[in-house]
Amino acid sequence: MVFFPELEQARLLRRYKRFLADIELANGEQLTIHCPNTGSMLNCMREGGQVWFSRSNDPKRKLPGTWEISETPQGRLACVNTGRANALVEEALRAGTILELAGFELLKREVAYGEERSRIDFYLEFADGRPAYVEVKSVTLGFPDTPVAAFPDAVTQRGAKHLRELAALARQGIRAVQLYCVNLTGIEAVRPAEEIDAAYAQALRAAVAEGVEVLAYGTRLDARGIVIDRPLPVLLNP
């Protein structure tokens, strides 16, 4: 995924009302931009830290830009725009980068499924007619002195619901995959954030016991673009 034009750099003044952020450009100009992240953004932003944002040329937009990347307190880079994860995964799927899911012949987005009326991020179908349901989560939570990232960064009942739906598919013999897109530099593994959401961690382990596949992929990212580039281990019982 290439950012065009290249992202602009600024200094974060504050994030507020969840979806708003005030930033200051190098020339002293201050802007209010959109924050496309509903999570707590724990450990992936700091007031006064560096951020990178994209500008919009749409005159109908109320805000001139979107916050894309943040410098974390640990000096890493995090893609805080959670909407990028699905686009990155689709790009990687079509390129064959995610080897565990290579060789599909059909890809559909946002397909309805399950008893709890969920929508799967990606429905894949292979040459022999076998389907695979793939749920994507964006990971940006890192910690000092460890290369292990964690998910989620806030309690997520929705995330636990998705795991239950995937587990129900697996019980029927249908391939179900939870894929973590790690949009954070300097990471070597992923784990459930049990200290933040124990119910989610338990749901993840239960889903794996039912046959759900859990994958994680890391990214390279900077102001020019982001690309999924390597598989990462998932530590279910760190």
UniProtKB/Swiss-Prot annotation:
Coiled coil start-end: none
UniProt cross-references to Pfam families, sorted A to Z: SfsA, SfsA_N
InterPro entries: SfsA, SfsA_C, SfsA_N
Signal sequence coordinates: none
GO molecular function, one term: DNA binding
PANTHER family to which the protein is assigned, alphabetical: SUGAR FERMENTATION STIMULATION PROTEIN A
Alphabetical list of NCBIfam families matching this protein: sfsA
Family according to the record: Belongs to the SfsA family.
Protein name: Sugar fermentation stimulation protein homolog
Species lineage: Bacteria, Pseudomonadati, Pseudomonadota, Gammaproteobacteria, Pseudomonadales
Gene: sfsA
